[in-house]
Amino acid sequence: ISETLYVEVHCTAGGRRAEAVIAGSHTRFVYLACDGEVVLDRRTGASSREEEPCVPLTLRRVFDYALTAPIDELAFIDEARRLNMAAAELALGGEYGHSLGRTLRGRRELHVMGDSLFSRMLAYTSAACDARMAGAMVPVMSNSGSGNQGIAATVPVAVYARQTGASEERTRRALVLSHLTAIYIKQSLGRLSALCGCVVAATGSSCGIAYLMGGGYREVACAVQNMIANLTGMICD
């Protein structure tokens, strides 16, 4: 096996047998068979030969696009906000996983941490992850193939925008800036980097929030530097 990413599964049930192989990327099936009958077989060269080349992104290009693209072209990001905030609201009203988000909104925790904008961002982001990791029947919008990364790139920015009364246009641009920054960083890490992906997504959020605070390109770039300086090296299990 020469693939960086390779998953092979054999299942038997009710006297029947199925096989599946994923290789090259997380959603790329290269072999499927059922009861000995091959449904799909493209195992030769399963890796990256068929993949489209990455768009040569830079932070400057990401920033300029997020701030200058016609606002209607960015409407797709509204769905990320709707889905991921809905997941947070669901978890805040129920018991999911470790209930970290709900706990952070408890009376004792509010007394200690206060009902600040920062604590709300923490609670809502944690709550959405609680719901997802507990298997709640609620969809979330991913980033770079990860639901938690999608949450971390969306919810802090959405909460900040809502609490500060940001306009719909600025909110939309901030969310696009956040998600594209995360994608830009992720391009350099490969599919199976040991670096925690939520660190990358949080770096994207810092850019979106910096923009909502009135920052320009310099401030956004400094936000990236601050995040990378503090969090690089956090390993994912």
Regions found by a protein language model. Give the residues of each.
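Alpha-helix capping and helix-loop boundary segments enriched in small/acidic/polar residues
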Residues: 112, 116, 144, 148, ...
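Conserved phosphate/anionic-ligand binding catalytic regions in large, soluble enzymes, centered on
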Residues: 137-155, 196-200
